[in-house]
């Protein structure tokens, strides 16, 4: 399996995988090689199981879930706040540089993969960075957040909100599950902490934070998750099934849209995903992709003949 990994751009069929074997073998490989790895399961539940496996086998701080950003389906148009936060956290992780040997893992599924995301440059422009010791007027920070769609409230309780009490500035980024508390001394950031919403108690201290808005609300170039990830290794249970699901969702949404020409601003297609994976390593449990048949096979587990 390591030899297959060392050959860039290969399509590798993993045969005779049973149970949680993929998680175990993949985790062992990732721990040795590092890098960015995107796992595409057949549905949300399978992706969640895979996520939990990697939480147990690797550093869970480097493992991210990438769900859809809508409740039930994009077809119904009802945004899911938790899904948006998880997607944004994964994108933020993909933007960070890694040292040699470090890794990050993204677990997703067809409906989530189908949704386009903002491009890295747009995300960088819309992100507000604050670190301890910065000279920053509170009014300037308020203006930056208001321009990014944040709402001022008395107490923050969900992403996209901020509050101000004297020199204490609370803000809830879309890339975090807990809000930040910035303590100002005059126009200097004196400390930054995460805190619990229910108790208001500090969870941990931070030296620097990125405050990310709801990226779905911004216009601009939108690309596939695979394009955003850049150089990565892709793991599919059944690549043809995933790409067919993506195209099926695209056709369903297209039938509901008043402006069909806008479909490409919301969803990718089979063709786009194949283009964005070109030249990247692909591991698969089923050799189902006619556009990219396996050029190597690895047998990891064997069963006794009946």
Predicted regions and their residues:
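ASCE RecA-like P-loop NTPase motor cores
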Residues: 1-304
């Amino acid at each position: 399996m390591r030899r297959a990994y060392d050959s860039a751009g290969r399509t590798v069929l993993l045969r005779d995988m049973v149970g949680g074997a993929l998680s175990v073998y993949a985790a062992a490989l990732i721990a040795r090689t590092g890098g960015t790895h995107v796992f595409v399961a057949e549905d949300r539940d399978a992706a969640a199981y895979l996520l939990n496996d990697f939480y147990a086998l690797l550093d869970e701080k480097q493992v991210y879930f990438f769900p859809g950003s809508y409740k039930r389906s994009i077809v119904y148009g009802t945004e899911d706040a938790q899904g948006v936060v998880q997607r944004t956290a994964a994108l933020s992780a993909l933007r960070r540089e890694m040292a040699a040997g470090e890794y990050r893992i993204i677990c997703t599924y067809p409906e989530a993969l189908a949704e386009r995301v903002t491009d890295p440059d747009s995300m960088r422009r819309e992100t507000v960075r604050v670190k301890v010791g910065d000279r920053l007027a509170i009014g300037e920070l308020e203006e930056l957040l208001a321009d990014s769609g944040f709402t001022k409230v008395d107490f923050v309780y969900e992403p996209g909100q901020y509050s101000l009490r004297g020199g204490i500035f609370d803000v809830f980024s879309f890339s975090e599950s807990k809000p930040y508390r910035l303590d100002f001394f005059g126009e200097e950031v004196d400390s930054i902490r995460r805190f619990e919403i229910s108790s208001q108690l500090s969870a941990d201290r931070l030296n620097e934070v990125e405050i990310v808005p709801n990226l779905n609300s911004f216009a601009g170039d939108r690309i596939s998750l695979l394009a955003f990830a850049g150089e990565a290794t892709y793991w599919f249970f059944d690549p043809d099934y995933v790409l067919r699901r993506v195209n099926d969702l695209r056709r369903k949404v297209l039938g509901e849209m008043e402006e069909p020409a806008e479909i490409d601003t919301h969803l990718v297609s089979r063709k786009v995903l194949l283009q964005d994976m070109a030249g990247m390593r692909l591991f698969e449990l089923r050799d189902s992709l006619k556009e990219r048949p396996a050029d190597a096979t690895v047998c990891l587990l064997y069963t006794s003949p009946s």
